[in-house]
Curated annotation (Swiss-Prot):
Catalytic reactions on record: carbamoyl phosphate + L-ornithine = L-citrulline + phosphate + H(+)
Function per UniProt: Has vitronectin and fibronectin-binding activity.
Protein name listed in UniProt: Ornithine carbamoyltransferase
Record-level GO BP terms: L-arginine biosynthetic process
Location of the protein in the cell: Cytoplasm
Keyword Cytoplasm recorded: yes
Keyword Transferase attributed: yes
Gene Ontology MF: a single term: ornithine carbamoyltransferase activity
Major location (coarse): cytoplasm
Family listed: Belongs to the aspartate/ornithine carbamoyltransferase superfamily. OTCase family.
This protein's GO CC annotations: cytoplasm
EC number: 2.1.3.3
Organism of origin: Staphylococcus epidermidis
């Protein structure tokens, strides 16, 4: 259970980072 929770947490962090980079790229295009 602990490993799965840690994995989900890391995945969420990765996703958030990708979201931020995507938004930054969008703002650069604008």
């Amino acid at each position: 259970m602990k490993n799965l929770r840690n994995r989900s947490f890391l995945t969420l962090l990765d996703f958030s980072r990708q979201e931020v980079e995507f938004l930054l790229t969008l703002s650069e295009d604008l």
